[in-house]
Amino acid sequence: MANVSFLFVVGIAIGCCTAAHAQPVPPPVVGDISVDPKEAAPLEEVRKLIAAGRSKQALAFADEHLAKNPRNAQMRFMRGVILSDMNDNDRARAAFQQLTEDFPELPEPYNNLAVLYAADGQLERARAALELALLARPDYATAHENMGDVYLQMAADAYQRASTLQPTNRAVSNKLALTREMVTKARTPR
């Protein structure tokens, strides 16, 4: 993903199991779609507005641009990221879902959809979205990392259930402690 100028990873599952843990980061340019030179300036304007913390203005600009250019996948992706940054997760989820339907070959919308699912505790849906991201691009390192985070959270949940059922099982207690430690370390901003 050499042409990605920014990376949007909110720390799937363990880094954003609640909205309070979400760490909004400027969005990437969708890697598999080349930028039409006339589209570069509007994308850069949105990036600048996002970087300046002016999400509402960035959203308005993106919406205005998309009214004239509804198939612009990069601007649509950025719109989803802006909505996510604004904690408008229902609309962000809808934006990323529509992108996956219109551009199933792009892994980034699946990844961001997975981030939102994980933030809501929907780990199975997050896992499924990440599988589709990896199907679209098997070498997408961010999706692999996020898949590991989802599996780690799933493991912690399973060990917690096992510990509740068998509170004296030392092996389960040790595994639960290890996964909790890993979850805590993974939440540390990088």
List the model feature ranges, each with a label:
Residues 39, 73-74, 107-108, 141-142, ...:
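Helix-start (N-cap) detector for alpha-helical repeat units in TPR-like alpha-solenoids
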Residues 23-39, 152-190:
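Terminal, low-structured helical/coil segments at or just beyond the last alpha-helical repeat
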